[in-house]
Regions:
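C-terminal active-site rim and adjoining tail of enzyme catalytic domains
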Residues: 31, 103-104, 110-186
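Metal-dependent phosphodiesterase/phospholipase catalytic core, i.e.
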Residues: 1-108, 129-134, 138-140
């Protein structure tokens, strides 16, 4: 994930040391990027969390291991998700007690988990078996979708992101089981 979306700085967040991240500000605020452990301490189990692990690479382990160390001591309800199906599979092997979700979006050539090297989640239902998914995270702009509907028919909940307007809320209510909101209170 690029730093420019939330901080205006350039670079990939996974390549910047935590001490440097602490010096960056989120948007126009005086808030810095919190570490996962800081977020977990702040939330302290008061609300359920879905932790999105952002690892765009084929090789897994570094990001996932760091997150699992922080999550090991967390007593609150949480799940993990990723666009990277290898990350989700890593979590199935190493964090089997946590619910897992595969995030998907619609790219020009159809449904894909992020990355050119990944195959279509909706055309290859095998992802469900290799990662034992408990939910699918789906971009609202990709709905309605026959592929998303097939997952729901198989009992896998569909959580849509990111709803910012009342018309998108109506679309999400018609095609999904739960919703991520941003800058919008329904």
């Amino acid at each position: 994930e690029s730093l420019d979306r939330m901080t205006g700085a350039r670079g990939e967040i996974s390549r910047v040391p935590a001490v440097e991240l602490a010096g960056l500000r989120l948007g126009e605020s005086d808030q810095s990027i919190p570490l996962l452990r800081e977020v977990l301490d702040l939330i302290d189990g008061r609300v359920p969390l879905i932790i999105e692990l952002k690892n765009p690479r084929r090789r897994t382990g570094r990001v996932e291991t760091a997150a699992s160390k922080d999550l090991a001591g967390y007593g609150g309800p949480c799940a993990v998700s990723s666009f990277n199906r290898r990350t989700v599979a890593w979590c199935a092997r190493n964090l089997p007690h946590l619910p897992r979700g595969q995030n998907v979006m619609k790219f020009r050539r159809g449904w894909f988990a992020a990355g050119q090297w990944q195959s279509s989640v909706f055309r290859e239902f095998q992802t469900r078996h290799s990662t034992r998914l408990q939910f699918i995270g789906c971009h609202i702009g990709a709905l309605p979708s026959p592929g998303a509907q097939r997952f729901r028919e198989r009992g896998i909940p569909l959580i849509v992101f990111t709803v910012r307007t009342p018309d998108r809320l109506a679309l999400a209510n018609a095609h999904a089981d739960n919703i991520f909101f941003e800058g919008f209170i329904p």
